[in-house]
């Protein structure tokens, strides 16, 4: 889906890693939540509270998912799932546009 209708957008940005990763929170009438953001090239580690679906809209990165022994390459148009209460690592190779859906 390239467009969301009838949503609430939180005006203040979520800013991480000194601006290397930024996003805006979108809340749907149903109560479900997503963030739309941009990641600059760099190495990042995130911790989840809820399970997440990370959709990479453009760009490319490598992800090390919880329990994995090797990095997985993800490009624009691909996605990956992250379990709740877990940590995952990213090596962002180019400016990356993403949509994160919170699944819990």
Swiss-Prot record:
Any GO MF annotation of the entry: uridine phosphorylase activity
Superkingdom classification of source: Bacteria
InterPro entries: Ppnp, RmlC-like_jellyroll, RmlC_Cupin_sf
Any one Pfam family match given in the protein's UniProt record, by short name: Ppnp
Catalysed transformations (reactions): a purine D-ribonucleoside + phosphate = a purine nucleobase + alpha-D-ribose 1-phosphate; adenosine + phosphate = alpha-D-ribose 1-phosphate + adenine; cytidine + phosphate = cytosine + alpha-D-ribose 1-phosphate; guanosine + phosphate = alpha-D-ribose 1-phosphate + guanine
Gene3D superfamilies: Jelly Rolls (2.60.120.10)
CDD domains xrefs: cupin_PpnP-like (cd20296)
Top-level EC class as recorded in UniProt: transferase
Entry keywords, A to Z: Glycosyltransferase, Transferase
4Fe-4S found in the keyword field: no
A single cellular component GO annotation: cytosol
EC number, UniProt record: 2.4.2.1, 2.4.2.2
Family, similarity comment: Belongs to the nucleoside phosphorylase PpnP family.
Role, per record: Catalyzes the phosphorolysis of diverse nucleosides, yielding D-ribose 1-phosphate and the respective free bases. Can use uridine, adenosine, guanosine, cytidine, thymidine, inosine and xanthosine as substrates. Also catalyzes the reverse reactions.
Family matches, as HAMAP family: Nucleos_phosphorylase_PpnP
Protein's recorded name: Pyrimidine/purine nucleoside phosphorylase
Lineage: Bacteria, Pseudomonadati, Thermodesulfobacteriota, Desulfuromonadia, Geobacterales
Underlying gene: ppnP
């Amino acid at each position: 889906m390239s467009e969301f209708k009838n949503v609430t957008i939180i005006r203040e940005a979520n800013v991480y890693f000194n601006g290397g990763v930024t996003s805006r929170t979108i809340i749907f009438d149903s109560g479900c939540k997503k963030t739309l953001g941009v990641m600059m090239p760099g190495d990042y580690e995130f911790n989840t509270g809820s399970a997440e679906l990370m959709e990479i809209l453009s760009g490319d990165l490598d992800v090390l998912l919880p329990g994995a022994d090797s990095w997985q390459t993800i490009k624009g148009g691909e996605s990956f799932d992250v379990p709740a209460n877990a940590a995952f690592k990213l090596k962002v190779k180019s400016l990356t546009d993403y949509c994160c859906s919170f699944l819990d």
